[in-house]
Amino acid sequence: GRGPVHINIPFATHHGVDFSVENLPVVRKITLNQLPLTMEFWKEKAQELSGKKIMIIWGQSVYPLVDVEKGADEFIRKSDAIVLTDNISNCHCCNSIFNTTTVLAIMKPTEMESLKPDYIITVGGNYIFNNEIKRWLKGMQCKHWHVGREGEVCDPFRCLSEIYEMPENHFFEQLAKIMETSSNINYSKQWKVISESPGIPEMGYCELFAITTLLKQLPINSDLQLANSQTIRMSQFV
C-alpha cells in the first residue's frame, strides 16, 4: 500500500507482432482496504460473512499475539470459524487445529468436498502445511481475504479478492462487534472430529522418538530454536 513502486517489464522484439488484440482479458480484481473505514463498510462485510463456512489460516509472526487472539476469539465464536495452524505459529485461539498436516492427509474425498470453505482469511506468515493446503485450495471457487499491517499481495490459492492493510486485532474486533452468532455450528465440529482421530504411534528409537522425548521435557516458557526443513516438521507432530 506504500510507494514508490518500480516495475520492470521485459519486452521481446516487436518485429512480427501485428497488435491485433482488441480487448484485454477479464481478470480477477483484488481490492485493497485501508484505514479509516466506515461502520457501514464493516456492517456490509459482517453481513457478507453471515452463515458462511469460514477458514482462518494462521501463520507465524503475528504480533502482538495476545491482542490479536483476544479479538479473533470473539469473531471465531460468533462465526463458528475454524483455525488451521501449527505449533510453530504459537496460536492459542479457540477452534484451532494444530495437526493440520495430518488432518489434510487423512481427509476423505467426501470430507474435502463438504468442508470446502466459502471464505479463507489468512493472517501471519509461513506455516508448515503450506504445500498440503495449497494443493487442496488452489483454484477453488471461494473468496480469500488477507489481513496484515503490510498490505502485501499474497495469492497462494489463486482466489485472493481483498487485502486488509491494518492490525489483525482491529479487523477481528470490528467484525465481532457487529456479527450475530452463527446458527451453523457444525463446521468447526466436523474439523475437530477429524483432528482428534489420529495420534502418534508407539515407535522404537529414531529421530522422531528423540525429538518427542526432548520436547516433552522442556520447561514451561522455554525459547526453542529449530533448524529448517525436517526438524520443524517432526517437532510439529509432538
Over which residues does each language-model region extend?
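A short, well-structured juxtamembrane/interface segment
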Residues: L35-E48, V66-E69, E202-Q217, T231
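Conformationally flexible catalytic loops at phosphate/diphosphate-handling active centers
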Residues: G1-G51
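Glycine-rich, anion-gripping cofactor-binding loops and their flanking helix/strand elements
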Residues: W58-W145, V238
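Acidic/glycine-enriched edge-of-secondary-structure segments
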Residues: S20-L37, S89-V103, P198-I200
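Structural motif
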Residues: K53-M55, Y119-I121, D223
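Glycine-rich beta-alpha junction loops
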Residues: I9-H15, Q60-V62, I88-S89, G151, ...
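Phosphate/pyrophosphate-binding active-site segments
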Residues: R135-I232
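Thiamine diphosphate
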Residues: I232-V238
